[in-house]
């Protein structure tokens, strides 16, 4: 139970990063919604002005989420807490995973600001990871398919 609470907390911190950037940029947004087995989302109530603004919002989540993971790491090392160290691993993993340049993932939105072809590269990377057996998670397969549809 404590690990589950920590996971929800780290996901909340990640989403709060998006919300803080939206507040700073004057973008209205909806309350956070948890999506079972996937994570959470905060929807923008207006489209970003341009791809760079979308990329800034996308980058806010992994930045604050990674800081949350660092806090868990520091706390885990200082207190020798296996729980905090495990949560740090989870935090690093979800933020790194979220930076894959695929479709609706944060990395896909950031890469899309750099080049319209970045989504194709992300799909190639994701497909290669699946083909090589590096990722065997059915939820990732769904994300990859949705990214292909979106690209």
Residue spans of the language-model regions?
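Hydrophobic transmembrane alpha-helices and their immediate loop junctions
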Residues: 1-151
